A protein has these predicted regions:
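Conserved RNase H-like, two-metal-ion catalytic cores of nucleic-acid enzymes
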Residues: 1-69, 144-228, 247
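Common nucleic-acid-contacting/processivity interface regions adjacent to the catalytic cores
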Residues: 3, 18-20, 132, 333-453, ...
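N-terminal accessory regions of nucleic-acid-interacting proteins
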Residues: 72, 83-165
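Catalytic nucleotidyl-transfer cores of nucleotide-processing enzymes
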Residues: 116, 123-136, 283, 296, ...
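A short acidic-Thr-Gly-centered motif at the start of a beta-strand
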Residues: 157-166, 220, 422-436, 571-573
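Active-site-proximal helix-loop-helix substrate-binding element of RNase H-like nuclease domains
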Residues: 199-203, 223, 227, 237, ...
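Active-site palm subdomain of RNA-directed nucleic acid polymerases
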Residues: 323, 565-585
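C-terminal polymerase-core module
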Residues: 591-642
């Protein structure tokens, strides 16, 4: 039997089957079924190129490479751009993904390695130019993994589909534990179907083994996509793992029954990640095969930056007038006494603490926003929720590099930064009281500079490279002395991607304005927010010292041009007799000339708009952000009221 439909991919891994490799991607269908995609035919590979600059007269001997036990095939060469100029690049196929690091190590020193540290599952998204939302068609097969549908497909059976709000199933839980003995006293879980909005509530007490068995059975029976709770990364997941391991000792069946939360077969053995049991390693977030662990504490911390990060504080911050959405009055520091005196109240308290994380996640729109970021960055949900910013940027940049014959260097291969990059310009604040202050902001300051000055790893002019601009090509020279190719000679990957993201955001903003349906408006809002997040992440990643497509001159040049722009405008305003009372990185605070004016409010607004328009340039567009009738500061930077 065949099945086709749209799915949202949550997470993935690979499995070795004989001599071949199968990708396993877990997803939730638009029609609500849980789906496992088993993708066949994708071969693991990396690329090599000779060390140093390329000279046509050089001989290349591939015997060392082809003689390696792990190597199955070599393709090429294809001429690709590298930081040392255009060079021949060979694609080396190996038997299994886990063989790539060993083969890289054996070739290190003799060859320059490219595309050698890209997780194998990412190849589904990169090679197919796919995102988390895809349309698939394949043969339905039986599977030991606990899913509604298992499909056997190839890359040709998957194609892009427009993003849609996936009907995820969410499992939110909480534990109450003994302070004296570390044992689990009770547990609670709330399961939500985001397709229907329905919730079911469950509580557990009794002996510890029974609690863990029933909680695990609830997970496996309800097949959630996302596991959440408050501070589960630092407490609840670890406590389940510790207690289940202590109880089960070497009894595998008991271990499965008490902590087998993964969306994988209970007969599976030998994996260290993406497995049946919760694992963590050195990462912040926990890892489960087929599910995304998404801590509400971490999401609230990122979204709200609250003064305190406790569940009580965050709940009160978000729901100050709703008594049903506050923590109950139970003293967690005396949990043993509370449990002995009023167990029913503690169970109710536990259930409340299991449900509040769901309410918080919806209030801060964490589920839909992470889904939107995944859709824009073209990664699985789990990468959006728990991955790094560089992983999101990698997804966009690497696929463009692959399609434009640009070699992909290894992470950490860039020159190390010798010191911190000088940041944005901060104009000393003038102490005192100032009336009618117009605030001007640079629109997307760093992205605009990167576009306007064509700043990219691929456009930086390096004397050590064989790839140099033509004699008549104009160059962009930054205040630091670094030089970049003109777009007439080479358009950078980063400016191209940023322009594309800006265009996407304009489309979604227009969609928000034109939407007559609240759900459509919400969709466009989430998407434009996700695009904004990604655009603003580019500078931080490319100015870092660890990213693969970077050089210290990139970040230095961006901030230098930004400082030059803002200082130039401040000087011109001063020459005109205007009074700048403060500026900080991408904002300028200008006092409006209102002497003898009847309506200073209207004058300030008109002054703000006209000043922004006068000083806007292609790579430095100013906007009138707002105005202050009164601005006061005691003279300290970043400290003012208005």
């Amino acid at each position: 039997m065949r099945w086709s439909g749209d799915v949202a991919i949550i997470t993935g891994r690979y499995a070795s089957v004989g001599d071949s490799t199968v990708m396993e991607l877990w997803a939730r269908a638009r029609s609500s079924e849980s789906v496992l995609l088993r993708v066949h035919g994708v071969k693991p590979w990396f690329e090599i190129t000779p060390n140093g600059r390329w000279d046509e007269s050089r001989d290349v001997d591939l015997d060392q490479v082809s003689s390696l036990e792990e190597v199955r095939e070599i393709e090429g060469p294809e001429m690709k751009w590298t930081d040392l100029g255009v060079k021949p690049v060979w694609k080396v196929f190996v038997g299994q993904p886990f063989m790539v690091p060993k083969t890289r190590q054996e070739l290190a020193g003799s060859w320059t390695i490219l595309s050698g540290d890209i997780p194998f599952v990412n190849r589904f998204f990169l090679d197919g130019d796919l995102s988390m939302h895809v349309s698939v068609e394949g043969e339905v097969v039986d599977s030991d993994h606990p899913v509604d549908i298992c499909l056997e497909i190839t890359m040709e059976d998957a194609r892009h589909c427009e993003p849609f709000p996936a009907p995820f199933k969410i499992f939110s839980f909480d534990l109450e534990t003994s302070i004296a003995h570390d044992t689990i006293l009770c547990a609670a879980a709330v399961i939500e179907d985001m397709g229907t909005g329905e919730r079911t509530r469950h509580t557990f007490d009794g002996d510890e083994e029974s609690i863990l068995r029933e909680l695990t059975q609830l997970v496996r029976n309800n097949d959630p996509d996302i596991i959440t709770g408050y501070n589960i990364d630092n407490f609840d997941m670890g406590r389940i793992s510790d207690r289940a391991n202590l109880l089960s000792k070497r009894d595998k069946s008991l271990k499965i029954a008490t902590m087998g939360w993964g969306r994988v077969s209970t007969s599976e053995e030998g994996r260290r990640r993406d497995t049946l049991y919760p694992t963590r390693g050195t990462a912040r977030a926990w890892n489960l095969g087929g599910r995304c662990v998404m801590d509400a504490w971490w999401q609230a911390r990122q979204a709200l930056r609250p003064q305190r990060e406790t569940l009580k504080f965050v709940s009160n911050l978000l729901f100050p007038d709703d008594e049903e959405m506050q923590k109950m009055d139970v003293d967690a520091s005396k949990m043993d006494e509370e449990w002995a005196a009023r167990p029913d109240v503690v169970i109710e308290y536990c259930l409340r603490d299991a449900e509040l994380p769901l309410d918080i996640m919806h209030k801060i729109q964490a589920f839909r926003r992470k889904e939107a970021v995944a859709a824009v960055a073209k990664v699985p949900l789990d990468t959006s929720a728990n991955g790094t910013t560089s992983q999101l940027i990698d997804s966009l940049v690497i696929r463009m590099a692959d399609r434009t014959a640009i070699g992909v260097p290894l992470t950490g291969s860039a020159d190390k930064k010798e010191s911190q990059i000088e940041g944005g310009y901060v104009h000393d604040v003038e102490a005192g009281l100032h009336r009618w202050v117009a605030i001007l902001d640079f629109k997307s300051m760093y992205p605009s500079i990167m576009i306007g000055k064509n700043i990219c790893y691929t456009t930086r002019i390096d004397e050590s490279s064989t790839d140099q601009p033509g004699a008549d090509e104009q160059e962009y020279e930054s205040p630091t002395g670094a030089k970049f190719r003109n777009e007439s000679g080479r358009r950078g990957m980063v400016p191209t991607l940023l322009e594309d993201l800006m265009a996407q955001r304009d489309v979604h903003k227009a969609g928000m304005r034109d939407a007559e349906d609240e759900s459509i408006q919400s969709y466009h809002d989430q998407m434009q927010y996700a695009v904004k997040i990604l655009m603003n992440s580019f500078y931080g990643v490319f100015a870092s010292g660890f990213y693969r497509f970077t050089h210290r001159q990139l970040g230095e040049s961006i901030t230098a041009w930004a400082r030059q722009n803002i200082k130039s405008i401040i000087q011109k305003l001063g020459d005109e007799g205007q009074h700048v009372v403060y500026s900080d990185t991408d904002s300028i605070f200008v006092k409006t000339p209102v002497e003898g004016v009847e309506n200073p409010y209207d004058t300030m607004i008109e002054f703000g708009h006209s000043t922004a328009e006068r000083f806007s340039e292609a790579s430095a567009e100013l906007e009138f952000e707002t105005g202050l009738s009164v601005f006061f500061s005691h003279g300290a930077k970043k400290r003012y009221v208005g």
